[in-house]
Swiss-Prot record:
The gene is mutS. CDD domains: ABC_MutS1 (cd03284). This protein is involved in the repair of mismatches in DNA. It is possible that it carries out the mismatch recognition step. This protein has a weak ATPase activity. GO terms for biological process: mismatch repair. It comes from Staphylococcus epidermidis (strain ATCC 35984 / DSM 28319 / BCRC 17069 / CCUG 31568 / BM 3577 / RP62A). ATP binds at G601, P602, N603, M604, S605, G606, K607, S608. One of its GO terms (cellular component) is cytosol. PANTHER family: DNA MISMATCH REPAIR PROTEIN MSH1, MITOCHONDRIAL, DNA MISMATCH REPAIR PROTEIN MUTS FAMILY MEMBER. This is DNA mismatch repair protein MutS.
Length: 873
């Protein structure tokens, strides 16, 4: 390393300033990487790792990618969480003596991607920062659209909820995180940058009401400007918001309800977002996800959205016309970002032109729909002046590159027209010269061609060179090929200077004109961003109307007395993936008097789906959308808590039961009377008595403290007696019938409890071996013969009492207990051969077992009983 070259010294100096990035170091037509960067990049990109100075004692690991195809390689690295620093040659090597000056012109990070190919058009690409100082300040930005928002709050739970909702691709912090907080955040993104210094740059944030919000916004904008190193005037003035203005849902609730990502496939398909996305624009699709993540809690704002949806529902033809216009609108938000950023091309501006040309049609259509839409979207503004500029300047199908000419229409610029005319006339002259030379030489295949090395030349194939004397025609030999000779004449050389001079001047002028046009369009940034926001909201609302009409949804109403009444409600996603009309709708009625449903029924009967659909319908309603019911009256929920399904948290080493308890703890701690709690089979991850005790205690706690609307499913049938002690609790069950030993799921929620979970019948549906099914039935029969079964544990007491809810403040008269009696001795289960079948059963027992009592009339039952009695005599 002692004899390191000046170029490598330059590399190492630059690399030391960007040690957390992979440095793409421009050398000619390649971006090269060295040392550890080369090893890492070659592995990730699957490209060859070579060595620089291979013959020396310590060769340097090296790899590289062509500069013209670097974008694809950079995208791969960014998607895997890397940062890439782009180091360009700032001078032309041909015109420089000594070392070429190089500088990092941009740092591309997961949260600052600006190239269209590297982004999903239906997703925001957020970068987020937060600062902790007793409280939290949090700011996030989508650099590609200019969106910038900030908030502050007091607790870590809200921090994690916000990070989950925003789902950033990169996080910037001021100090290192605790291991526990880092672990939780790494579940969302692993790209975390520590940036200790905050500049004193003035970003015009005087309107912010809290110092923490000011500091975290400063931290984020410092980092964005440090990485991008160019104009970012499209980033909007920071908007202050409060997390409490929206319904709260934590990571577990969003995951369990599958709002934007399915649990099994980790994809959009099968989610609420998948169902509701009938948007026509990229901005609308991104706005829809934001609305799903943040349902409203302001009744007036919700009803404003619902009223617009209602107008769209009533006017199908106008809505269909609107959808056609929206379909012609491109991604205005990101096009404006590219204009400001400086990487917009002429085709992008044509997309912008087409987009704003639709605004007058959309506004006229909204005026026809009625006063509500006219008022709601009154700020929709036809940008006629900008449209005229774009219409008069650019050709309809320009090239992708802005440095090759061919961008502008004739008549846009007089000087450009002169250059283009000279170039055009010169090419006409070349065509005439080619015809003249063919006639003069008698060589019909003679042609005049061009390349960047030799300019214009006359080419004659070798077959036509026999007996041909070039000098006689004034031809000077320029190049010899294997099958042809190339010549030039004084006349052609003179004309070449004129033609190429005009072409070069035209291309140079077009580039200058395009830059001026881009800078002019930049002055429309704020107006364009406002139009994009309005169009995105309009797109969401028409999407709500589209799915409502397509799937027969209804307009929800909101009660002031906290009543939840759903008639024939359906799960919006599940019914779409089922065959037509196969979904069984169900009712739900909760109010101040009865706010807990205790739900029993077999596995696979639909308990979890029923609970999920109540939560999802509530979310849809508070988004301002119609809901899948015959009628729906709802309270406005401030929070939704869920505990559904079983999942170990392997990353943190937490068991299924521990995860279950942590989720339950959040609900029990933070729920209010305006919250909704979904508990699915709480307590199943531990022993029977522990689980039963915890489940009962949780129900009693909700009944005595928060009074939150609660749906609680269970297989602990002992809990069904709680309705005698808790007036706020109602037993319901998901019905099923057993017919000839087969279980038939009815999926209908009915009043009352059931005392059988049909576990063995469900196991039979899963095709467990018959020997296991038969053996389980024998054991079950043995258990059911006891007054109350018990497991063989040495610590089983003669009598065990489970306290009721009196511990939470009931008076002596209100106290109750649930007593679980056991025999005077431990029950020792008899042993059987696994492959023994049922105990010997009589024919009468078999007939009784197969009776379908629910479908028999009293008379039929008496006749059957008499028949069985006769057989026993």
């Amino acid at each position: 390393m002692a004899n390191i070259t000046p170029m490598m010294q330059q590399y190492l100096k630059i690399k030391s300033e960007y040690d957390d990035c992979l440095l793409f170091f421009r050398l000619g037509d390649f971006y090269e990487m060295f040392f550890d960067d080369a090893k890492e990049a070659s592995r990730v990109l699957e490209i060859t790792l070579t060595k620089r100075d291979a013959k020396k004692e310590n060769p340097i690991p090296m790899c590289g990618v062509p500069y013209h195809s670097a974008d694809n390689y950079i995208e791969t690295l960014i998607n895997k969480g890397y940062k890439v620093a782009i180091c360009e040659q700032m001078e032309d090597p041909k015109q420089t003596k000594g070392m070429v000056r190089r500088e990092v012109v941009r740092i591309i990070t997961p949260g600052t991607v600006m190239d269209q190919n590297g982004m999903d058009e239906k997703k925001n690409n957020y970068i987020l920062s937060f600062i902790e100082n007793e409280e939290f300040g949090l700011c996030y930005c989508d650099v590609s659209t200019g969106e910038l928002k900030v908030t502050h709050f007091k607790d870590t739970a809200t921090l994690l909820n916000e990070i989950t909702t925003i789902n950033p691709n990169e996080i910037v912090i001021k100090q290192a995180l605790s291991e526990e907080l880092k672990r939780q955040i790494n579940m969302i993104t692993e790209t975390i940058t520590v940036r200790e210094d905050i500049s004193d740059e003035d970003y015009d944030m005087n309107q912010l009401t809290h110092q923490l919000m000011h500091d975290t916004t400063q931290l984020l904008l410092d980092y964005i400007h440090h990485t991008q190193k160019r104009d970012l005037s499209h980033i909007e003035e920071v908007i202050e918001y409060a997390a409490v203005d929206y319904m709260k849902m934590d990571y577990y609730a969003k995951r369990n309800l599958e709002l934007t990502e399915s649990i099994r496939l980790k994809s959009k398909k099968g989610t609420l977002l998948w169902l509701m996305d009938e948007t026509k624009t990229p901005m609308g699709a991104r706005r829809l996800k934001q609305w799903i993540d943040r349902p409203l809690i302001n009744k007036q704002q919700i009803n404003d959205r619902l009223n617009i949806v209602e107008e769209f529902m009533d006017r199908f033809i106008e809505r269909d016309t609107l959808r056609n216009h929206l379909n012609q609108v491109y991604d205005i938000e990101r096009l404006v970002g590219r204009v400001s950023y400086g990487n917009v091309n002429a085709r992008d501006l044509i997309q912008l032109k087409h987009s704003i040309s639709e605004i007058p049609h959309i506004k006229a259509l909204l005026n026809e729909l009625g006063a509500q839409t006219t008022t709601q979207f009154k700020e929709l503004e036809p940008l006629d002046d900008l449209l005229q500029i774009l219409e008069e300047s650019l050709v309809e199908e320009p090239p992708i590159s802005i440095k090759d000419g061919g961008l502008f229409k004739n008549g846009f610029n007089a000087q450009l027209d002169e250059y283009l005319e000279a170039s055009k006339n010169g090419k006409t002259w070349l065509a005439e010269l080619q015809a003249k030379e063919r006639e003069r030489t008698g060589i019909k295949s003679l042609k005049i061609s061009f390349n960047k090395v030799f300019g214009y030349f006359i080419e004659i194939t070798r077959a036509n060179l026999n007996n041909f004397q070039p000098e006689a025609f004034g031809y000077n030999r320029k190049q010899t090929l294997s099958n042809a000779e190339r010549f030039i004449t004084d006349e052609l050389k003179e004309k070449e200077d004129i033609i190429l001079g005009a072409e070069d001047k035209a291309v140079e002028l077009e580039y200058e004109l395009f830059v001026k046009l881009r800078e002019h369009i930049k002055t429309y940034t704020e107006r364009l961003q406002k139009q994009a926001k309005i169009i995105s909201e309009l797109d969401c609302l028409q999407s709500f109307a589209e799915i409502a009409q397509k799937y027969n949804y209804v307009k929800p109403t909101f009660s002031d007395d906290k009543v939840l009444h759903l008639e024939n409600s359906r799960h919006p996603v599940v019914e779409r993936v089922m065959d037509y009309n196969d979904y069984v709708p169900n009712d739900c009625h909760l109010d101040d008097e009865t706010f807990i449903y205790l739900i029993t029924g077999p596995n696979m009967s639909g308990k979890s789906t029923y609970m999920r659909q109540v939560a999802i319908i509530s979310i849809m309603a508070q988004m301002g959308a119609y809901v899948p019911c015959d009628s729906a009256t709802l309270p406005i929920f401030d929070q939704i808590f869920t505990r559904i399904g079983a999942a170990d948290d392997l990353v943190s080493g937490k068991s299924t039961f521990m995860v279950e308890m942590l989720e339950a703890q959040k609900a029990l701690t933070y729920a209010t009377e305006n919250s909704l709690i979904i508990f699915d089979e709480i307590g199943r991850g531990t022993s029977t008595y522990d689980g039963l005790a915890l489940a009962q205690a949780m129900i009693e706690y909700v009944a005595q403290t928060s009074h939150a609307k609660t749906l609680f499913s269970t297989h602990y049938h002992e809990l069904t007696s709680l309705d005698q002690m808790l007036k706020c609790l109602k037993n319901v069950h998901v019905a099923a019938n057993e017919y000839q030993g087969e279980l038939i799921f009815l999926h209908k929620v009915k009043d009352g409890a059931v005392d059988d979970s049909y576990g063995i019948q469900v196991a039979k549906l899963a095709d467990l071996p018959n020997e296991v099914i038969d053996r389980a039935q024998v054991i079950l029969n043995a258990f059911e013969q006891k007054p109350s079964y018990q497991l063989s544990h040495e610590n089983t007491d003669n009598q065990q009492t489970v306290p009721s809810y009196n511990d939470f403040g009931r008076t002596e008269e209100e106290q109750s207990v649930i007593e679980t009696h056991t025999s005077n001795h431990n029950y020792e289960q008899a042993t059987f051969d696994l492959f023994d079948g049922y105990n010997q059963q009589s024919e009468v027992e078999c007939q009784i077992r197969e009776l379908n009592l629910s479908n028999m009339t009293p008379l039929e039952a008496l006749i059957k009983l008499n028949e069985l009695q006769s057989q026993l005599k």
